[in-house]
Amino acid sequence: MTADANKSESLLCMDKAREAIKSGDTDKARRMLLKAKKLDPGQNIEFLTKKIDDMTNNTSSSSQTSSSRASEERSYAHDDHYDDPNLRNRKARSPVKKNGKTEPEPKQRSASRTPKLGVDYTSEQKELVERIRHCKDYYEILKIDKKASDDDIRKEYRKLALKLHPDKCRAPHATEAFKALGNAYAVLSDTDKRRQYDQYGAEAANSHTPTTRRRGGGHGAFFEHDYAHGFEAEFTPEEIFNMFFGGGFPTEQVRRRARYAQQQQYHHYEQQQSPYGPLLQLLPLIAIMVIGLLAQLMVGEPAYSLHQTSKFTIKRLTADLRVPYFVRTDFETSYRGRIRQVEQQVEDDYIQNLRMNCYKEQNLKETKLYRARWMRDEAMMRDAERTPLPSCIRLNEIYSH
């Protein structure tokens, strides 16, 4: 089981390396490749390593510019030490003197160095967290019915996970809600676990769950459930999120918090300078709503399908990974000049599906091995060891390409 887990982690590192190469982060790509090789010595990393070397050679001429930019960032980092409370206290004890009189420091500088106090979450985020904490079952968490398809489950998880991830949502109990959401997706996206969950139901599970706690009182009381309901997921909510999105939030955590602090300082300064501060703060939200509305109006039918349908009948292969996909008869005319971008999206979707299916296959195999060891059944053990892993094999082929 440990070897299978290491191979699974190795595949995830290979996927992160591929994403880092696409974004131009060669240092991160090398780290991920070395980690993948360490987890699985049989992993083939030569192709991607050569790709990184080629990228490094092509960008060597811009190294001086990168060095000067790094020096500039270090100077800013040095300037950030002024946020240290001890330094602020020293400056407060040593006021500026002019003509024998003590003068306070400029307000503008003080305001820019003072962190903004108060909550850093929206009412919408708080309402979302509270809604999930009050849910009685997994279907209610994802806001779907019991006949929802796998696509519906993935769609709702994607939408809610981006809103609830701890790096983005800092409302009270957000971590608890994020864990509940991850466990709901892990159970409902697995055919066997979903069937068991539907069979026993949330109420039946609660009657055997010792971690259910009473909250509130009177008619307004609610139960804070153990969201596992006896169907605990093999992966943590963070691992599920990384499987689904390729680890997007964790890699950006530091930079996003820095941008957030800068934005808060800027808004604080703007509020002091302009009476229209509250209105200006609403402008980004209004812009996002308008852009979202326009995007909904402009969205048409997808350009391709990974499966042949009555509309998508023409089979094509991507230029890089030779992934099969299907398009309409007018595809080349409608997407002239954009075919490369479409094929990139095809490969991204294909790899994401393989990654999720590989985790499920590994999970199924590990479950069979565990049951065989628990029952001490050699026949079951042999059957578990022969469990096919087609998605994992295909991922290995792609990374060896």
Swiss-Prot record:
<keyword id="KW-0472">Membrane</keyword>
<feature type="transmembrane region" description="Helical">
    <location>
        <begin position="279"/>
        <end position="299"/>
    </location>
</feature>
<comment type="similarity">
    <text>Belongs to the DnaJ family. DNAJB12/DNAJB14 subfamily.</text>
</comment>
<feature type="domain" description="J">
    <location>
        <begin position="137"/>
        <end position="201"/>
    </location>
</feature>
<dbReference type="InterPro" id="IPR018253">
    <property type="entry name" value="DnaJ_domain_CS"/>
</dbReference>
<feature type="compositionally biased region" description="Low complexity">
    <location>
        <begin position="59"/>
        <end position="69"/>
    </location>
</feature>
<keyword id="KW-1133">Transmembrane helix</keyword>
<feature type="topological domain" description="Lumenal">
    <location>
        <begin position="300"/>
        <end position="401"/>
    </location>
</feature>
<dbReference type="GO" id="GO:0030544">
    <property type="term" value="F:Hsp70 protein binding"/>
</dbReference>
<keyword id="KW-0256">Endoplasmic reticulum</keyword>
<dbReference type="InterPro" id="IPR036869">
    <property type="entry name" value="J_dom_sf"/>
</dbReference>
<dbReference type="Pfam" id="PF00226">
    <property type="entry name" value="DnaJ"/>
</dbReference>
<feature type="compositionally biased region" description="Basic and acidic residues">
    <location>
        <begin position="70"/>
        <end position="87"/>
    </location>
</feature>
<feature type="compositionally biased region" description="Basic residues">
    <location>
        <begin position="88"/>
        <end position="99"/>
    </location>
</feature>
<dbReference type="Pfam" id="PF09320">
    <property type="entry name" value="DUF1977"/>
</dbReference>
<keyword id="KW-0143">Chaperone</keyword>
<dbReference type="GO" id="GO:0071218">
    <property type="term" value="P:cellular response to misfolded protein"/>
</dbReference>
<dbReference type="InterPro" id="IPR015399">
    <property type="entry name" value="DUF1977_DnaJ-like"/>
</dbReference>
<dbReference type="GO" id="GO:0051085">
    <property type="term" value="P:chaperone cofactor-dependent protein refolding"/>
</dbReference>
<feature type="topological domain" description="Cytoplasmic">
    <location>
        <begin position="1"/>
        <end position="278"/>
    </location>
</feature>
<dbReference type="GO" id="GO:0065003">
    <property type="term" value="P:protein-containing complex assembly"/>
</dbReference>
<dbReference type="InterPro" id="IPR001623">
    <property type="entry name" value="DnaJ_domain"/>
</dbReference>
<protein>
    <recommendedName>
        <fullName>DnaJ homolog subfamily B member 1</fullName>
    </recommendedName>
</protein>
<comment type="function">
    <text>Acts as a co-chaperone with Hsp70 required to promote protein folding and trafficking, prevent aggregation of client proteins, and promote unfolded proteins to endoplasmic reticulum-associated degradation (ERAD) pathway. Acts by determining Hsp70's ATPase and polypeptide-binding activities. Can also act as a chaperone that promotes maturation of potassium channel unc-103 by stabilizing nascent channel subunits and assembling them into tetramers.</text>
</comment>
<feature type="region of interest" description="Disordered">
    <location>
        <begin position="50"/>
        <end position="122"/>
    </location>
</feature>
<dbReference type="GO" id="GO:0005789">
    <property type="term" value="C:endoplasmic reticulum membrane"/>
</dbReference>
<keyword id="KW-0812">Transmembrane</keyword>
<dbReference type="InterPro" id="IPR051100">
    <property type="entry name" value="DnaJ_subfamily_B/C"/>
</dbReference>
